[in-house]
Amino acid sequence: MAKPLSLGVEVVGDGITDRKRDVEDPSRVITDLVHRLEVAGVDYWVIGAERGEAGQFGKVALDPSLIATFAARASRRLGLVVAAAGHRDHPYNLARRLISVDHAARGRVGWLALDFDHGTALNAVSDTWTGADLTADHTADAVTAVRTLWRTWPLESVVGDVDSGVFVDVTRIRRADIAHGYAIAGPLNVPGSVQGDLPIWRHADALGADLAVIEDGDPVTGGAPVVVRVRAAEVIDAALERIARIPSATGVLLRVTPGILERVLDLVVPAARARGLLGEPGTGTLRERLGLPVPATPDLSAHRAVFESVATPGGRL
């Protein structure tokens, strides 16, 4: 029996069709695109996915987190999934940058964890911090490190008690003490997300992720819930019918060119929603809208407190 799928969209070139003009005036391009996606009821926009594919990434582009930061301001409901890799970016930088964008978007940001970033490679074929090969296992280490850092400073510790003068209950801030793949003491210098953890997408091998992205037609294995990517515009209708009947498929990810985006959003998406193949746009954080529970791990309850010897019970206002 078919079930309603969540809807993600990747726009080739992130919607930048005239690279010289659009990179010089990105605000118009991003605002326009975000508005169109929201009106169409798209659940989330994946920004920068092509960076993970050799031969697909263009020579001129804006950083996905920069686009997402602007899109957060220009949108109210649309989820923003940022593509990034533990390649030239250290997990600490990834964790801080992603959580900062999520704060700007009030809990609407996710992460597509890439193995390799062709947009920032600059001839680097390994992790520029550790020298590790850029494999799926390496990405799993980066995902674990980022998740751990997100949990070192829980958002709930920010109490903002004016009467007592306590800003943060610092006894809840934990060390990361990451030793596998990376050596990171932590904690992160930004509080965690209202989502708990940001949702994470990974290609095929979903170790450590909330959702696995597979290509339409590829075999579906067990493990994390699956999002199926459809690249051919002419087969979207048939693909949605088929994907909605895959037991582990929870969503579809449409990669479209700017030239056909209008037709897909104005004709294909409403028709599929009318047939019950796509769900109605939800409310709340991105994690809540996608029905994703917060992972149980990593558990930092046994990690050392950062401020064990602090003289006061919390950061002062």
Residue positions per predicted region:
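Acidic (Asp/Glu)-rich catalytic clusters
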Residues: 1-2, 35-39, 68-76, 98-108, ...
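Active-site mouth loops of central-metabolism enzymes
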Residues: 8-28, 83-92, 115, 128-130, ...
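Extended, intrinsically disordered, low-complexity segments
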Residues: 132-143, 148, 152, 275-317
